[in-house]
UniProtKB/Swiss-Prot annotation:
Family membership noted in the UniProt record: Belongs to the fluoride channel Fluc/FEX (TC 1.A.43) family.
PANTHER family: FLUORIDE EXPORT PROTEIN 1-RELATED
GO biological-process terms attached to the record: cellular detoxification of fluoride
Gene name of the record: fluC
Name this polypeptide is given: Fluoride-specific ion channel FluC
Length: 126
């Protein structure tokens, strides 16, 4: 990746993170048990990555920096859930149902387990 790719990822990531933060500021306090801002960021990111993958797959002639800006940068900054979602859907479209299921299990189960482990580690060391 050249210098323009690094800039594209950085600018996109900053914009996505700012939007995610804005959602959190606006909506997370409404229901702390289910933070609506985080949910909105994840659901919007999942939807937008589907649109983006479809767009970039049909516009292969665009410079790769546009994809880096939109998907890796912006949607990665908005939520990593969008990347995860696109990977699972790609497996499903390819008919790789076992891989899609394993992807779900490892990402969701692993994230929950490691979050609990991180909390346990903090409490142990605090």
């Amino acid at each position: 990746m050249g210098p323009l790719g690094f800039v594209a990822v950085g600018v996109g990531a900053a914009a996505g993170a700012w939007l995610r933060w804005g959602f959190a500021v606006l909506w997370n306090a409404i229901n702390p048990a289910l933070p609506y801002g985080t949910l909105a960021a994840n659901l919007l990111g999942g939807y937008l990555v589907g649109l983006a993958v479809g767009f970039f797959d049909t516009h292969a002639g665009l410079p790769p920096e546009w994809r880096l800006l939109a998907i890796t940068g912006f949607l990665g900054g908005l939520t990593t859930f969008s990347t995860f979602s696109s990977e699972v859907v790609a497996n499903l479209i390819a008919g790789d149902y076992g891989w899609a299921g394993l992807h779900l299990l490892l990402h969701l189960g692993g994230s929950l387990l490691l979050t609990a482990f991180g909390l346990w580690t903090y409490r142990l060391l605090a």
